[in-house]
Structure formats: structure tokens, C-alpha cells
């Protein structure tokens, strides 16, 4: 089996190192192709206005001067002599829950794999400074081993969030839907050394709605959250309402 690993934290991130350590012996071929630097929050951006370059870092580890989606696109688009059987993106340091998945480069790398017809997993440890990355990696290995024996279809993309807990303290696995964040991202104004105004987009301070069955609720209760994702973001419930609204314009 040929497994492609990517992420948005960069090829040398702690999460990637932990994942490589456990996955090396689990597959016949393991390749890392990830951004050369941290690309958190870039979502599904593709680089279309300049060429991409690839650097090699030892055995089967490659970096790209582009986005997470670029990395997967390059990896499966002909850079290697074969295409992967699966794409895993992660381990991200920080949660990718609820509607925040729209911003996530981690989820986008997995989405790109899914878009190109490969089963894909997006993996996140919910802590920004995790203490239990090795435990998280072991849980990923457990899930991967199960998926390997019970293959995913090419239409599958799973967003997996794991509490930052010792493996023995994880309560189990919940299949969840995306929850909702209360969006409050303050704009922080600063003055740089050249006395110019500059701005930081602050972290979301609004919290979340931990409705039962949501990914937020599962994490809050100490479970691994697994949410199947898809591309179609059509608001089906509004189709008829919008048609009716536009009748006078026809």
C-alpha cells in the first residue's frame, strides 16, 4: 500500500513527525509531501500565479513552497511514479471542528485527495500545544489498521479530531456532525517598528455550541470525533424559497 501524508503545519512539524513514526511500518510505501512552512488557515487555496518547487529532506520526505492543496495536487499529479492508495493529512496541532473546517488547510489537503478520487483522512489533536501526540498517533494507527482491513471507498473523507489525552483515557469513538462556532474574531490593531498600522485577526473567542451529536460535544465528553464530509454545500432547504423569491424577476 502507498500512503501519502500531508498537513498544513509544515513538513517538519511535531505532528507530522509523530505520524511518520507510527506509520512507517504499517505500509509498503510512505511518502510525506507537505508545505515548507506553516500554512494554517489557508483553506483550499491553490497556487496559480507562480511555479511550485519541491525540496527533498532525507528519505521520502518532500516539501513544497505552496499550500496544503498544492502539495497533494503535486504528489498525485505525476511527481511520483505511482499514485497513493490513501491520503492522510495531519496530525494538526489544534482542533478542526464545526464550521472552522472551512478555514482549515489540514482538512483542505484531505479534501484535495478526495477530490482526486482517493479516500482521505484529516487528523487533528485538539490542543495547540499537545502533550499526548504519541498517543494521538497510536490512535491514528489503530484507525488506519481498521480501515486497511475494511477499505474505504474513493468517495470517503473523514474529519477526525482526537482529545489531547492519554490513550487509556479516551472514552471511545463517536460519529458526529459538524457543530457550530460562535464567531467572534477580534481585529487587533498594532503599530509596527516602521510606525505603520497593522492588524492581527484574533483567535475565535466566541466558543461553540456543544449540541448532542456534534463534534464539539464528542470532544468535550472525551471521545474521538469522526465526521464524514462532502463537497456539496448547497442549502437544499432554501432552493424552493429562492425560486419563489425570484419569480418576479422572470
Curated annotation (Swiss-Prot):
Recorded GO molecular functions are: 3'-nucleotidase activity; 5'-nucleotidase activity; exopolyphosphatase activity; metal ion binding; nucleotide binding
**InterPro entries per UniProt:** SurE, SurE-like_Pase/nucleotidase, SurE-like_sf
**What are its GO cellular component terms?**
cytoplasm
List the keywords (alphabetical).
Cytoplasm, Hydrolase, Metal-binding, Nucleotide-binding
SUPFAM superfamilies from the UniProt entry: SurE-like
Q: Which residues bind a divalent metal cation?
A: 8-9, 40, 92
The UniProt record lists the EC number as 3.1.3.5
Annotated localization:
Cytoplasm
Cofactor: bound how, per the entry note?
Binds 1 divalent metal cation per subunit.
Q: What is its main location?
A: cytoplasm
- Give the cofactors, semicolon-separated: a divalent metal cation
Task: Note whether Ribonucleoprotein occurs among the keywords.
Answer: no
- One Pfam family, short name please? SurE
Q: Which reaction does it catalyse?
A: a ribonucleoside 5'-phosphate + H2O = a ribonucleoside + phosphate
UniProt lists the family membership as follows: Belongs to the SurE nucleotidase family.
The UniProt entry, under HAMAP family, shows: SurE (MF_00060)
**Which PANTHER family did the record assign?**
5'-NUCLEOTIDASE SURE, 5'_3'-NUCLEOTIDASE SURE
Q: What does this protein do?
A: Nucleotidase that shows phosphatase activity on nucleoside 5'-monophosphates.
**Protein name per the record:** 5'-nucleotidase SurE
Question: What gene makes this protein?
Answer: surE
